[in-house]
Amino acid sequence: MALHVVLFQPEIPANTGNIARTCAATNTALHLIRPLGFSTDDKMLRRAGLDYWEFVNIHYYDSLDHFFQQNQNGDFYYITKFGKRYYTSYDFSDPSKEIFFIFGRETTGLPKELLAENEDRCLRIPMTENVRALNLSNTAAILVYEALRQQSFHGLS
């Protein structure tokens, strides 16, 4: 497993369900950091993921610290509108690397101290100034498919 999507305290079940479907389609692991803003039995979550849940490699953590303790050998990238560099300026081309794309809450993003400690790994997707943020599930798909594009869609048909 080379690609990972990490959701820090996601709040909207449909976003997480859509991301789970993208993860199933791309053999990308999904990591959820509690607390979640919904039950994993939520109808909207299940509906968005359709019948692909059995194909999702999903992991749960009680905190960011717990997540980092369990995943020490990865390349971590923090997705934020405050990143100084575009996502396209990073090299994700090595399919043997464990690449983690870390996303924050839909309403508040990632903790500011985490971003400050990892400024060189904060990346963003360009957009006009009149839009506050892209949808979380769309953003995750953009990052996953950019990494896969750089890897010549390794393992996909």
Swiss-Prot record:
Main location per the UniProt record: cytoplasm
Molecular function via GO: RNA binding; tRNA (5-carboxymethylaminomethyluridine(34)-2'-O)-methyltransferase activity; tRNA (cytidine(34)-2'-O)-methyltransferase activity
Gene Ontology annotations for the cellular component aspect, listed alphabetically: cytoplasm
Pfam families to which the protein is assigned, alphabetical: SpoU_methylase
UniProt subcellular location: Cytoplasm
The keyword Transferase is annotated on this UniProt entry: yes
Keywords: Cytoplasm, Methyltransferase, S-adenosyl-L-methionine, Transferase, tRNA processing
Keyword S-adenosyl-L-methionine: yes
Record-listed E.C. numbers: 2.1.1.207
The reaction(s) this protein catalyses: cytidine(34) in tRNA + S-adenosyl-L-methionine = 2'-O-methylcytidine(34) in tRNA + S-adenosyl-L-homocysteine + H(+); 5-carboxymethylaminomethyluridine(34) in tRNA(Leu) + S-adenosyl-L-methionine = 5-carboxymethylaminomethyl-2'-O-methyluridine(34) in tRNA(Leu) + S-adenosyl-L-homocysteine + H(+)
Any one biological process term the GO annotation gives: wobble position ribose methylation
Residues holding S-adenosyl-L-methionine: I79, G104, I125
Annotated family: Belongs to the class IV-like SAM-binding methyltransferase superfamily. RNA methyltransferase TrmH family. TrmL subfamily.
HAMAP family: tRNA_methyltr_TrmL
Function, as annotated: Could methylate the ribose at the nucleotide 34 wobble position in tRNA.
UniProt protein name: Putative tRNA (cytidine(34)-2'-O)-methyltransferase
Organism whose genome encodes this protein: Geobacillus stearothermophilus
Lineage: Bacteria, Bacillati, Bacillota, Bacilli, Bacillales
